[in-house]
A protein has these predicted regions:
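Acidic/glycine-enriched connector segments
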Residues: 1-116
């Protein structure tokens, strides 16, 4: 049964997942914010798409006790909302900080978004 895989289009795991989807006949939807370098070759999310994620991102920030200090970081976390939202199965890969208490990058945010 063909699957639809949602990815954020980053180098590394996301790129590998895109190749595997094409190899095995699965659909791959690459969701990126307008600031992403690949936005020229793919259709990026619109600002209204990103804004739709803001209420959930705000709740997740409160739950994690974290703040977003850069608009580009915000766009990537908003993008992750659109990767997580339609998912029935999530495979999250990341690195822990040196104390193994926090996931680095936006992956931790995405995992918490699963409960919203």
């Amino acid at each position: 049964m063909p699957l639809t895989i949602y990815t954020g289009g980053a180098k590394g795991v996301d790129t590998h997942v895109e190749r595997l989807c094409h190899l095995y006949g699965h659909a791959c939807v690459v969701l990126i914010p307008p600031c992403h370098p690949r936005a020229k070759s793919l259709v990026p999310l619109t600002q209204s798409d990103l804004d739709a994620a803001t209420p959930t991102v705000t709740q997740v920030a409160f739950r994690l006790g974290r703040q977003i200090h850069h608009s580009i970081s915000l766009q990537y976390i908003q993008r992750n909302y659109h990767v997580i939202q339609p998912a029935s199965l999530v495979l999250a890969l990341s690195h822990f900080d040196e104390y193994r208490k926090h996931l680095l990058g936006g992956t931790g945010w995405s995992v918490v978004m699963l409960s919203y």
